[in-house]
Swiss-Prot record:
EC number: 6.3.3.1
Matches recorded under CDD domains: PurM
Main location: cytoplasm
Any one GO molecular function term: phosphoribosylamine-glycine ligase activity
Pathway: Purine metabolism; IMP biosynthesis via de novo pathway; 5-amino-1-(5-phospho-D-ribosyl)imidazole from N(2)-formyl-N(1)-(5-phospho-D-ribosyl)glycinamide: step 2/2
Keyword set includes rRNA-binding: no
Species of the source: Yersinia enterocolitica serotype O:8 / biotype 1B (strain NCTC 13174 / 8081)
Keywords: ATP-binding, Cytoplasm, Ligase, Nucleotide-binding, Purine biosynthesis
Coiled-coil spans in chain: none
Similarity comment: Belongs to the AIR synthase family.
Designated name of the protein: Phosphoribosylformylglycinamidine cyclo-ligase
Catalyzed reactions per annotation: 2-formamido-N(1)-(5-O-phospho-beta-D-ribosyl)acetamidine + ATP = 5-amino-1-(5-phospho-beta-D-ribosyl)imidazole + ADP + phosphate + H(+)
Primary enzyme class: ligase
Gene (name only): purM
Subcellular location: Cytoplasm
Amino acid sequence: MTNKTSLSYKDAGVDIDAGNDLVDRIKGVVKQTRRPEVMGGLGGFGALCALPQKYREPILVSGTDGVGTKLRLAMDLKRHDTIGIDLVAMCVNDLVVQGAEPLFFLDYFATGKLDVDTAASVITGIAEGCKQSGCALVGGETAEMPGMYHGEDYDVAGFCVGVVEKSEIIDGSKVAPGDALVALGASGPHSNGYSLVRKILEVSNTDPEQTQLDGKSLADHLLEPTKIYVKSILSLIEQLDIHAIAHLTGGGFWENIPRVLPQGTQAVIDEASWQWPAVFSWLQETGNVSRHEMYRTFNCGVGMVVALPAELADKAVELLTASGEKAWKIGVIAAAAEGAEQVIINP
């Protein structure tokens, strides 16, 4: 009988000790996100969370998202500390547009070979995003899968659950001609359009770390974390009658604003009401991207659009500005014939 080599999981490329080390590293930052409704801590088979008692008819709202190929850029530039904020932002911003308060968040981190420092940096960013949105990070999955990813490449996904009072759900049904549209400024491209961003960098042979734009590197502009609007929007909803909110993500203006508009209405946007941030002008000029394609791919400096009665528009801008947002009146809702475009951008 020949002696056989004894194989272990680590020999196959999965380091359980590294996974345990990661959990120990992140416990402190995760604890900082805790909400009173959360029961228990990390390590259970499932996370337990009670519904806040202030809701009479609580409706749960859920969402899941990733950060697209912004992640590839972050990996290429070896900047892992803010991509977690992007991940949370993409999920919680989708919830708050329906009037929902984010309750808890879970993440999925998958890699071919677990680098504990990188993973801890990403999850610390996730915890920061949860703190910014008042959301508890209740658990996650770290999957080390040799052969599935190249080297130490990784992917992340986020899952969020929020709650809204049934009578206060914002679904766009109250939108009517004459409503005003108020914009909330974006921090940058957020987490959309990065395949085009990377193509422009490639074709133009641009090094984003060596290219200066408006006083900082292009890399800083492109990796600026997605703005989290949760606290500003929830505060606005408490004080004013909000008819609809659109989160400008993939599909830009053309596809996201119509998602909250009833039939027979259209959003008329005044392009002169704001100036594109420098990064968008650079992308358009360097990539020779058409105006239509820019508005289809990027937020062009507008992270959210709020529809509300015209007489409340000035107050909304005032309240949002007091919350630290850059806000302005960007357009109006008009009546539209059947089959007409639902978004018009007037130069």
